[in-house]
């Protein structure tokens, strides 16, 4: 692809994403499906703007590579060791059982046994990019089903190596015999990467961070991710596995959060590019000529994988409410199928349209997953949003709540417990199904689902409630919910959690005056105690705390985001001088009346 063509392709990708994803979100089908549909539209079987799909698909795999690096940063070796049973137990069982069943079914459709084995293994793999994206959207990361799903995906990445090695053996063209010297060199290179990463990465990043230039740190992070991906690709191993290992090696370093911040924007764009590329690869010609075969294949593929995953989740002891989420989110074919089937085709394992049919099946199965997860959500809503159980009635004597609490993480739990302790009738909206199960055991009235859905808010009693407390983790969800409440439930008193000053500004601009910055009050209290330990009288420290809070809130209201940076800096300096003057006056006054104050805490 020439430079001008590459630039044109980039513009088309961005336009497709900007046009399709917001529309898909408004239709309620999710961003992932929006990307896939955008790819179909601009691909060779749609409007035909882009024809070189294979090259773009290979490049777009970098989205998965960046995603795996960030996941590696969230784990450390000890955490990975704790997951060994689920990785090598459930993960291995899923790959083996799904491969065997799918290979058997392919043999019934006139595939040779060698092609059926390769087809079964390829179809048994799930899409790492899609599954992890959906797990984050559904709040599954903290749940047992999310941890188990990640373990299965990690084993599938590990299984890439033997699967690719199996293809030439099945084709009978394994270069007469294995070149054990070459294999040994690859193993040594892999071990060298592990040892080098373990002892060299931290000193290197420490040296780069000492320069104080943020752009260089970002460049070094990109170099690490892309370099480890290319190194693993040169060894014939999974690029995603290489960056995952690099992430794990840096998970306990002091640069973990900075690395994640540097990579995150690239990850999002490249993941979108990956999904668009998958949509472009859908061969509508094959779909049209073999429509019945493809539809049956997609249904059978999804059904077999759901059955295997559900049974394994049950054997592993996953809660019944989480099994369908776990099975549904991993029910599609994955990006590895494109690599494996291309390798098998080069070895002449497939005949006629067999490879094209398998790839169409994989692509369509990926498109079914967002829709399937919506059905699972609706099923869970019916299961958990029904009438109250008998053991919950003593806690909720009146069906009409006084307060709705959205989100029940660490922040929301404190609020909920305080309200319950004071006999307030509350209803909780939570999207983490494991948290829903736990809260119901302790008598909370809980609705499962996305709080930005108006119907769910109505079911939870928003029309009768007096207040709503929004404690969402994501600022975007908070602002969307504020807008919905102001539009559909204007009588509600809105109280919200702000993660920092930026979110506080947004809430003020939206007309929400009752909010709490999650670290502000606790930091102020600790600061007051620090002043006392430094010799300041408790009364004086208390007054300093109150003055600081009052002045900070006034600054927050005055320094709206539209102001120029220089204006904000100037106003901040002026406020600091004003605060110093207040403190000095207070100190002079307190020296005259210290004895009139009882010891505070």
Curated annotation (Swiss-Prot):
Q: Where are the transmembrane segments?
A: 4-24, 29-49, 55-75, 87-107, 115-135, 152-172, 177-197, 207-227, 230-250, 268-288, 291-311, 324-344, 356-376
Q: What is this entry's stated membrane topology?
A: Multi-pass membrane protein
**Tell me, which GO biological process terms does this entry list?**
proton transmembrane transport
Q: Which residues form the RCK N-terminal domain?
A: 400-519
Sorted keywords for this record are:
Antiport, Cell inner membrane, Cell membrane, Ion transport, Membrane, Potassium, Potassium transport, Transmembrane, Transmembrane helix, Transport
GO terms, molecular function: glutathione-regulated potassium exporter activity
**GO cellular component terms given for this protein:** plasma membrane
Q: Mind telling me which Gene3D superfamilies this protein's record contains? A: 1.20.1530.20, NAD(P)-binding Rossmann-like Domain
Its subcellular locations are: Cell inner membrane
* Family the entry assigns: Belongs to the monovalent cation:proton antiporter 2 (CPA2) transporter (TC 2.A.37) family. KefB subfamily.
Give the protein's biological function. Pore-forming subunit of a potassium efflux system that confers protection against electrophiles. Catalyzes K(+)/H(+) antiport.
The record's annotation in NCBIfam families points to: 2a37, PRK03659.1
Its quaternary organisation is:
Interacts with the regulatory subunit KefG.
Name used for this protein in its record: Glutathione-regulated potassium-efflux system protein KefB
């Amino acid at each position: 692809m020439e430079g001008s063509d590459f630039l044109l392709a980039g513009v088309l990708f961005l336009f497709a994403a900007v046009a399709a994803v917001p529309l898909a979100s408004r239709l309620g089908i999710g961003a992932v499906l929006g990307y896939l549909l955008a790819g179909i539209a601009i691909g060779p079987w749609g409007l035909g703007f882009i024809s070189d799909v294979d090259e773009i698909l290979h490049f777009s795999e970098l989205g998965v590579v960046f995603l795996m690096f960030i996941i590696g940063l969230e784990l450390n070796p000890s955490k990975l060791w704790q997951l060994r049973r689920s990785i090598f137990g459930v993960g291995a069982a899923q790959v083996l059982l799904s491969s065997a069943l799918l290979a058997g079914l392919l043999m019934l459709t006139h595939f040779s046994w060698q092609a059926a084995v390769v087809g079964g293994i390829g179809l048994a793999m799930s899409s790492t990019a899609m599954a992890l994206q959906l797990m984050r959207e559904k709040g599954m990361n903290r749940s047992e089903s999310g941890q188990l799903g990640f373990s299965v995906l990690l084993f599938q990445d590990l299984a890439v190596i033997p699967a690719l090695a199996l293809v030439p053996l099945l084709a009978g063209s394994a270069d007469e015999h294995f070149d054990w010297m070459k294999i040994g060199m690859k193993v040594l290179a892999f071990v060298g990467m592990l040892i080098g990463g373990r002892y060299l990465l931290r000193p290197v990043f420490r040296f780069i961070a000492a320069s104080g230039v943020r752009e260089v740190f970002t460049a070094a992070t990109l170099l690490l991710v892309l370099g480890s991906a290319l190194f693993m690709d040169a060894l014939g191993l999974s690029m995603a596995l290489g960056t995952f290992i690099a992430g794990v090696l840096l998970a306990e370093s002091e640069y973990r959060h900075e690395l994640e911040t540097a990579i995150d924007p690239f990850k999002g764009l490249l993941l979108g590019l990956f999904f668009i590329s998958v949509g472009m690869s859908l061969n509508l010609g094959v779909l049209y000529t073999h429509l019945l075969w493809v539809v049956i294949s997609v249904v059978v593929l999804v059904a077999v994988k759901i059955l295997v995953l559900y049974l394994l989740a049950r054997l592993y002891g996953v809660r019944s409410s989480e099994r369908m989420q776990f099975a549904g989110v991993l029910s599609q074919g994955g990006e590895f199928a494109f690599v494996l089937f291309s390798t098998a085709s080069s070895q002449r394992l497939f005949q006629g349209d067999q490879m094209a049919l398998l790839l169409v099946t994989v692509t369509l199965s990926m498109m079914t997953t967002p829709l399937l997860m919506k059905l699972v959500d609706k099923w869970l809503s019916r299961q958990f949003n029904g009438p109250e159980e008998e053991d919950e009635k003593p806690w909720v004597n009146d069906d009409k709540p006084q307060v709705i609490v959205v989100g029940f993480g660490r922040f929301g739990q404190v609020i909920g417990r305080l309200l319950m302790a004071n006999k307030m009738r509350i209803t909780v909206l939570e999207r983490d199904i494991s948290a829903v199960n736990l809260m119901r055991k302790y008598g909370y009235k809980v609705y499962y689902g996305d709080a930005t859905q108006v119907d769910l808010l109505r079911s939870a009693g928003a029309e009768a409630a007096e207040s709503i407390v929004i404690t969402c983790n994501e600022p975007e969800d908070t602002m969307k919910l504020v807008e919905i409440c102001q539009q559909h439930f204007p009588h509600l008193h809105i109280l919200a959690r702000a993660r920092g000053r930026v979110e506080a500004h947004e809430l003020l601009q939206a007309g929400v005056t009752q909010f709490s910055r999650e670290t502000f009050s606790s930091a102020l209290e600790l600061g007051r105690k620090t002043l006392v330990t430094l010799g300041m009288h408790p009364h004086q420290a208390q007054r300093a705390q109150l003055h600081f809070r009052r002045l900070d809130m006034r600054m927050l209201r005055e320094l709206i985001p539209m102001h120029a940076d220089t204006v904000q800096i100037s106003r901040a300096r002026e406020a600091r001088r004003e605060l110093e003057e207040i403190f000095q006056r207070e100190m002079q006054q307190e020296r005259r009346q210290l004895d009139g104050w009882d010891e505070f805490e």
